[in-house]
Each structure stands twice: as C-alpha cells, then as structure tokens.
UniProtKB/Swiss-Prot annotation:
Keywords: Ribonucleoprotein, Ribosomal protein. It comes from the Bacteria. This is Large ribosomal subunit protein bL27. Pfam families: Ribosomal_L27 (PF01016). The lineage of its organism: Bacteria, Pseudomonadati, Bacteroidota, Flavobacteriia, Flavobacteriales. GO terms for molecular function: structural constituent of ribosome. Belongs to the bacterial ribosomal protein bL27 family. GO terms for cellular component: ribonucleoprotein complex; ribosome. InterPro entries: Ribosomal_bL27. GO terms for biological process: translation. The gene is rpmA.
Length: 84
C-alpha cells in the first residue's frame, strides 16, 4: 500500500460542446426554401407537407410559407409549411 496519494488523478474536467439542437423556427413564422426548422436526434418531430427530413433528422422547408406544428399523439408532432 502506498503511504502517499498519487498526485495528478483528475479524471473529471472534460465536457463535449453542445450540439445546438432544437426548434429554430417556431409556428407562425415564415420559412424560406431550404431553411432549417428543427434540428433533432431521432424523429421526435415528423415531416408532413412541403417539408423534408435530412439524413441527420433535421427538418427543412421545401417552399416559402408559414410553419404549422400539429400534434396527433402525445409524443408525435408533425411539421408542415403552408404556402402564403
């Protein structure tokens, strides 16, 4: 057994940078084609009309219009863009 504690035992002190996930444009706001509406991990929000999902589950607008959020279940929410 050691009589003195080993110095330099800092196992903590590292952290990852935040991924900046979440809603970028809210309901009622205007979206341009290609603009990011939601950045997410997995499919918490699902695309509906005039919206497409990227390979990292980011939801983008296809057209110029107003954003509409709609919930069907307690967990599922759908995003669509209504043309103006």
């Amino acid at each position: 057994m050691a009589h003195k504690k080993g110095v330099g035992s800092s196992r903590n002190g590292r952290d990852s940078f935040s991924k900046r996930l979440g809603v970028k444009l809210f309901g009622g706001q205007i979206a341009k084609p290609g603009s990011i509406i939601i950045r997410q991990r997995g499919t918490k929000h699902h695309p509906k009309k005039n919206v497409y999902m990227g390979k990292d589950h980011t939801i983008h607008s296809l057209i110029y219009g107003k954003i509409l959020f709609k919930k069907t279940n307690k967990k599922k929410s759908f995003i669509s863009v209504i043309p103006i």
